[in-house]
Amino acid sequence: MQRSLVGSEMCIRDRDATAITKIYNEYITNSIISFETEPLTEEDMLSRIVQISSKYPYFVYETDGIVVGYCYAHAWKERAAYRYTAETTVYLSPAYTGRGIGTLLMQKLIEECRNKNYRALIACITDDNIASKSLHIRLGFKQVSHFKKVGLKFDRWLDVVDYELLLTP
């Protein structure tokens, strides 16, 4: 089984948008993990990938040539003073969860963010997403907030928690 990380220093390929769109749309349509409610087109996803990866680290995980997960950093807030803080995002194909891929992706992302002199990373997680919360805790993130009933999806009010990882002392 061949596995590889493809990232921003190598380039995200246009063809990756197809797999990334499929992975993300699964979470949009069938879960409360993403707060988006309408599936994205490949064109929309490619546009996002190009925009994000031009400024921030973006990594894709492949197994046997198939994209099964991805993660990236992006702006946490738009004001200039926040420029050394980034928000993290990680998604895996549901068939590939629980195999350590999310950990590998996030470790690479954290390393790259350190190399780019980010000071802090923030993960905004749906409170019911136990797997993501556990992943972030294992990676050293600490919960710093809990917002109650801030999202409505599938006729259900959802809480969101923020986790923070300080990259420098």
What are these regions (language model features)?
Residues 1-7, 12:
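Single conserved hydrophobic/aromatic residue that forms the stacking wall/gate
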Residues 21, 25-48:
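Conserved GNAT-fold acetyl-CoA-binding loop/helix
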Residues 39-95, 106-107, 166-167:
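Acetyl-CoA-dependent GNAT
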Residues 72, 122-125, 137, 142-159:
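Conserved catalytic-core motifs of GNAT/GCN5-like acyltransferases
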Residues 88, 121-123, 163:
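A structural signal for short, well-ordered beta-strand segments
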Residues 92, 98-115, 133-138:
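Conserved acetyl-CoA-binding loop-helix of GNAT-fold acetyltransferases
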Residues 97, 123-133:
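Conserved beta-strand-loop-alpha-helix junction that forms the acyl-donor binding cleft
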Residues 113-125:
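Conserved GNAT acetyl-CoA-binding A-motif
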